[in-house]
Amino acid sequence: MPMDEIAATDPVAILREIEESCRVCNTTDSRQAIEIFSEWSGIAFRIGRNRLLAPLDEVVEILDMPKLARVPLAQPWVRGIANIRGNLLPVVDFSGFLGGEVATVTEKTRVLVIDYDGIYSGLVVDEVFGLKHFMESEHADAAPDVDGFLLPYIRNRYRRDGRVWCEFSLFALADTPQFLQTAI
């Protein structure tokens, strides 16, 4: 009996027909191989010439550069404190902290906010490109082409369109004792 006729007559018959269709689809003869791909997602950003990825679960929020209150007697890489919806957010110059050149603030400058093990902090980056997804097949063993001061925090690399993207662990950065030593 065609499905149209069943629908017009008996709802229980409709359910039986659906169940039978599912049974047919699940037989070994009609099964199709399903490939499951492992995907990794991260926030793509830039520090100087370095294009990096932050694991998605390590970034709480991405902000435009907020207004900052200066912190006296702080390291030069401490940009200041921002009031974000009633929460005080210490803002650190990402590159400056790692020994690189202090970032120049432009309209593309963003702040990556982390909240790790009691450390709530913002990291100034030159630019954020957005969310990137990489398949397991895009994992690369190539040596990272990034400034040396970033190397201790590089976890994985992915190749796409001739470019190698390096996964940078913001949590590993926040775990360093120097990150908490903000006073001069």
What kind of feature is each model-predicted range?
Residues 1-184:
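An acidic, low-aromatic, low-complexity terminal/linker signal
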